[in-house]
Amino acid sequence: MQYPAATAEGLSGPLSGAYTLPAFKFQPRRESIDWRRISAVDVDRVARELDVATLQENIAGVTFCNLDGEVCNHCRQPVDPVLLKVLRLAQLIIEYLLHCQDCLSASVAQLEARLQASLGQQQRGQQELGRQADELKGVREESRRRRKMISTLQQLLLQTSAHSYHTCHLCDKTFMNATFLRGHIQRRHAGMADVGKQKQEQPLGEVLEELRAKLKWTQGELEAQREAERQRQVQELEMARQREMEAKKKFDEWKEKERSKLYGEIDKLKQLFWDEFKTVANQNSTLEEKLKALQSYSMTESHLGSLRDEESEERLKHAQEVQALQEKMEVQKTEWKRKMKALHEERAAERRQLQEENERLHVSLSQDQKKAAAQSQRHINALRAQLQEQARLIESQEETIQTLSLRKVEEVQEMPKAVATEEDSSEEELEASLEERQEQRKVLAALRKNPTWLKQFRPILEDTLEEKLEGLGIKRDTKGISAQTVRRLEPLLRTQREQIARSFREFPSLREKLNKEVSSRVKQRWESTTQPDGQPPVKSQRVTLATREVRPKTRTLTVALPSKPAEPSTPTLQGHSSHGPGLTQVSTPIPRPRVHGPSSTPVSPGSGLSSTPPFSSEEEPEGDVVQRVSLQPPKVLPRSAAKPEDNWGWSDSETSEESAQPPGKGSGGLASSGTLVQSIVKNLEKQLETPAKKPSGGVNMFLRPNAALQRASTPARKSQLSEDESDVEISSLEDLSQDLGQKGKPKPLSHSKLPEKFDVSPWSSGSRPRIPGW
């Protein structure tokens, strides 16, 4: 028992000062061991899993059981005494350890109670310390306030009078009366009383002089301090001004650098756009040449009597190539748009970055720098406005180029959709010309010098036109518009014209002036081109043919194209028939030789016979073919010679139709019924819409136009001609004057040999061309 006692002494050693250990005594063991419960315990599992709960359950039964009467179950012999001694020793150790555990638990509980008490005492001490700190702070404030009060009272005492107080000459204390002063001197300055008396005997003047000297010295010190402070402030201001000047200089340098960088980027963008534009123009010209080559290759020649094409596969191949080229052009346009969008986004990002940098610099600058920054900002805004003005100028020039290209390629007899779009383009042209007339003249001069630019701009103009048509509600693949669509678009177009007219007050007078100018020019040119032998000029058929043949590169194709019907020579043939040989009408016309003789009876263009036979052999010489198509000056009838020159030399059928109309609606009344262009278009439509009788042996080599398309285009055309404010008339006057100037010089055919299959009779209904809409 010495070892447990030593252990208990060692354990209770640190806690002996805190409390005393209770008395310990081993308990007697009378209970028997529960072998069934012990056998149910898995010792290996308890050791492996650290099952403390199982140990707590069995600790009491193992510690306080009696093992003296236990015997072996097999041999019925008592337990080995040595083993029994070991077991009893283990029981005693466990009991002692339980006692130590209880003591330690009690000690921990006691220490926790003491810790809680100490924490409470510490909290109370902190509260008391805070309260005392507050009291100390209040006492200090009170002391400071009383000190100020005492100093104020002393100053008041000094300021009241020199005889109302008594100052100690040995210290700086002051007293109310002499008794207090004497007591003070006797208490504090007993050994210096004699010296004090001598000082008191000094005259008051010396004291005043001394005080004045002190006052002057103090004032000098104050002046010196003020001067030093003033010098320091001046130096600080000078340094600040120098810093501001340096910052302003740096800002100006940065601004110049940014401006030069911006100008360089603008120049690069301009050069890039110009290169892209040249590339697009070259590609467009190349593609158009390829397209024309394919179209020329796609021409096929059908033998007489054969109604099917001999090269359908080749034509299909060419059509596929054309479609592939168009798709390639669309892909290129998409790529260009994407590049433009990326460039705009990059420009916007750079602009935002510059604005952020500018704002940051504005915040860091002083007042003078802010003024300079505001001035630079105004300059930047002015430059930006100039850039925007240049962009608007470029857009207006592009619109002018588009309208000019539309003016060069427009047809007299086009679809209503193209008419409506060209009206919008002409309105934009008028607005741009009123704003930028000088730049427009330069563009016109450049276009006159290089007409091939119009061919290069055509795809771009087509895209712009299609976008505008889509904006008006007309789809991209529409071949024509109905009368209902025309009626729906008329109010919109009329409203747009009214808005433009309100914005330009001088529009009516300018329109009237241009109308008179063009009318006089056309009349002068018409009179100047009159034949010298007194014969009247060529009829409207010649004008129509010249108008058709002047533009073989734009809307219409040559006569040799089989896939798209070209402009026929029907008006010319009809002109020949109206003034050709005297032939009587028969029920069944037969082919006759081309014999010209005097006419005895005038025949109208609609019902007369042509001098050209409906069929021609393939062995005809080239000279005969050209002779059939070329214009011949007709012989004038006696009643047509009596007409004045103001009738402009129209055909007999037109003269009869105009004489039947009421006054003011013919082609001679330009001031009341409309412009000259409307009269010419009406006469051309009358000539083309005149029905013709087809012979029994004739073969129609052209596709018949769609009747629904004709019915749809008729009201739209009438609506176009009824609008006096249509800008199509203004855009086509210059081309019309040029066409009238070339009326006597028809453009030769594009091929040396004209296919005989196109030498058809004038009564064929397929002679009217089909004008495709964009």
Curated annotation (Swiss-Prot):
One of its GO terms (cellular component) is intercellular bridge. It is found in: Cytoplasm, Cytoskeleton, Cilium basal body; Cytoplasm, Cytoskeleton, Microtubule organizing center, Centrosome, Centriole. The modification Phosphoserine is found at residues 425-426. GO terms for biological process: ciliary transition zone assembly; cilium assembly; floor plate development; neural tube patterning; protein localization to cilium; protein localization to organelle; regulation of protein localization; smoothened signaling pathway. Disulfide bonds: none annotated. Residues 415-435, 515-674, 686-774 are annotated as: Disordered. Residues 421-433 have a biased composition (Acidic residues). Residues 597-616 have a biased composition (Low complexity). Residues 515-526 have a biased composition (Basic and acidic residues). Its main location: cytoplasm. Keywords: Cell projection, Cilium, Coiled coil, Cytoplasm, Cytoskeleton, Metal-binding, Phosphoprotein, Zinc, Zinc-finger. A zinc finger (C2H2-type) spans 166-189. GO terms for molecular function: zinc ion binding. Residues 204-450 form a coiled coil. Belongs to the DZIP C2H2-type zinc-finger protein family. Involved in primary cilium formation. Probably acts as a transition zone protein required for localization of PKD1/PC1 and PKD2/PC2 to the ciliary membrane. Interacts with SEPTIN2. This is Cilium assembly protein DZIP1L. The gene is Dzip1l.
